[in-house]
């Protein structure tokens, strides 16, 4: 179990989820991931100005992962070239140009990340990308989750909501999320019923275990509430 910092109401949801898992026979180990604080460290993020008019952080610098921006352009270009049919869009620059030509339709939330990604070559050859990728794998995989699983003899790690997405996604490790409960407040703002999920993440090729764990918890907790819209 690892969840870092959480608001009190979200902690209460997690506490109930842990009780359910223990009732099912799970053995829970609460332990820190030693390199969790390395994620997003120097050399792994890029400064991008937030120009989204609907964002409370407009005008501030965002720090998206370097690897994400480089791989976004590379992956999207390959998809548009090899798989997209019925469209004139063949690369990211075409998408950016379309958005600029149709601002009311396409730029309601800006395209800061697309513009930042477009500044890269798109072939993953740059030193900045390769260096950031190596640091990500060292922090998230080699000295992170791999060491964590070995040291504590774990089958999976449990994260609240998407709190584990940053570290599990970097080495490409699988995760599955199921409903855990609801809270009435998010970042100090009241919400009617804001859903909180429970994420099960595991090492490479552990999808079969994760699906069994998540299904057993989902059936026992019965926290899924279909949307009413």
Predicted regions and their residues:
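Short connector loops at secondary-structure junctions
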Residues: 26-54
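Short helix-loop capping/hinge segments that flank enzyme active sites or metal/cofactor-binding pockets
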Residues: 2, 49-140, 187-198
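Structured segments of extracytoplasmic/periplasmic soluble domains
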Residues: 17-20, 24-27, 78-86, 98, ...
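Short hydrophobic beta-strand segments
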Residues: 1-6, 40
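Flexible, glycine/charged-enriched surface loops at secondary-structure junctions
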Residues: 25-34, 87-93, 225-228
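Generic hydrophobic alpha-helical segments
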Residues: 42-43, 76, 145
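Glycine-rich, small-residue loops and helix-cap segments
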Residues: 10-15, 20, 35, 52, ...
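Active-site pocket-shaping loop/turn-to-helix segments
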Residues: 4-14, 63-66
């Amino acid at each position: 179990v690892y969840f870092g910092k959480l608001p009190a109401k979200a902690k209460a949801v997690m506490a109930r989820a842990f009780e359910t898992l223990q009732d099912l026979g799970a053995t829970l180990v609460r332990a820190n991931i030693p390199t969790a604080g390395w994620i997003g460290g120097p050399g792994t993020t890029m400064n991008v100005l937030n120009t989204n008019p609907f964002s409370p952080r407009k005008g501030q610098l965002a720090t998206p992962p370097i690897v994400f921006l480089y791989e976004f352009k590379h992956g999207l270009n390959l998809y548009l070239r090899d798989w997209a049919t019925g469209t004139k869009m063949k690369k990211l620059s075409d998408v950016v140009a379309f958005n600029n030509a149709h601002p009311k339709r396409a730029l309601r939330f800006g395209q800061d990340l697309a513009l930042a990604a477009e500044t890269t070559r798109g072939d993953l050859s740059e030193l900045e990308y390769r260096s950031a990728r190596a640091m990500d794998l060292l922090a998230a995989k080699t000295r992170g989750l791999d060491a964590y699983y070995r040291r504590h003899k774990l089958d999976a790690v449990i994260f609240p909501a998407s709190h584990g997405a940053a570290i599990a996604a970097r080495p490409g490790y699988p995760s599955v999320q199921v409903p855990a409960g609801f809270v009435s407040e998010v970042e100090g703002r009241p919400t009617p019923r804001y859903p909180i999920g429970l994420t099960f993440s595991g090492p490479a090729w552990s999808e079969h275990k994760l699906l069994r764990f998540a299904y057993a918890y989902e059936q026992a907790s019965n926290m899924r509430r279909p949307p009413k819209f």
